[in-house]
Amino acid sequence: MRKRLLYTLLGVGSILCCMVACDTEIENEILQKELTADEQYYQNLRDYKKSDHAICYGWYAGYSSEGSPSAGNHFTGLPDSIDIISLWSGIPSNNPRYVEANTYNERYLPVAYEEMNYIRRVKGTRVVACTICRIKNTEFPKTDAGLEAYAMHLVKSVLRNDLDGLDLDYEPEGDWLSGDKFTKFIEIIGRYLGPKSNSGKLLIVDFYGDVPASATEPYVDYFVRQCYSKEDATSKRASELQREYDEISSWCPPSKFIVTEQMGWHWRNGGVKFTEADGNQIDSWGNPLYSVIGMARWNPTQGRKGGFGGFYFEYEYNTTRPANKSLGDTEMEAIPYYSLRRGIQEQNPALD
């Protein structure tokens, strides 16, 4: 077992998270006192996020309940060291006229808008728009002209809201916009977003079953694989993650590959029981290893991965871990966002 290490940039929230233990029902809210730090801390945090490291990535929707007293429903309550947030409940706006037609998936959420831009400005967190990438049920025709118009529509949604990029959820399920057409779609967007655009804006593709073509790779910053445990699953092994990466390893560098869990289903324990390649089932703190932290610890045999993360990770704000004695946990107090906080530490351990 690796030596216990505390990543000092994990955030004041993770270091000072002595909280009252909560019930295991997600609807029970905890009020978390907002913690602050000095400017040097935030400068170090921003510098860390600009460095070459495996990132923490997540789809987040909790901000849509901006009136909630729970920190789990606010951008400012997120772990400081999350690198990229994909907006799963629309783009927050502070301009009600901007969202009248909702053409760009914008929502009038002024509190969320301010908090989102605070974590971008102060904590260096990048925030990207997210869309399920299908042309059906849109206003755009299934033609080359329609393809380009749809691509430019998504680019504009990023630029007019000054976001940090775009996450395309590639799950065509028979949609016209797939295969070679999706590659062309990526090439168009790639003129304005992604590594070939020189814009500083991210272009991300996330996917589950259908795999994007290798020709998309030069245009994309990260490929995020939904390595989701089924809702009724109880365990996962590192070998499963390796197979997920091997499917694209001939053309996708490991540093572009992000592995993610379905935390909306598996929030109580931080995933399902996880077994590493060497048979280990314990984390660096002596607690039973579950798949979110297991994904953070894992790397493909080809090299360091791009990162780890989760879908609907806000569900884990109310957790009993790592103090759930029924699972074999060894600690005394629960930690909000336990799996993400500890996963970041496992993935990027501090140096002695």
Task: Label the model's feature ranges.
Residues 330-352:
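Short, low-complexity, Pro/Ser/Thr/Gly-rich segments in the mature regions of secreted, periplasmic
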Residues 44-45, 73-74, 295-296:
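Generic recognition of flexible, low-complexity loop/linker segments
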Residues 275-300:
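Extracytoplasmic/luminal low-complexity segments enriched in Pro/Gly and acidic/polar residues
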Residues 12-13, 236, 299-302:
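Secreted, disulfide-rich extracellular signaling modules
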Residues 42-46, 242, 337-345:
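Generic detector of well-ordered alpha-helical segments enriched in charged/polar residues
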Residues 52-284, 305, 309, 314, ...:
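Chitinase-like catalytic core of GlcNAc-active glycosidases
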Residues 1-7, 13-52:
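Bacterial Sec-dependent N-terminal signal peptides
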Residues 49-52, 296-305:
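Short, surface-exposed loop and linker segments with low hydrophobicity and enrichment for Pro/Ser/Thr
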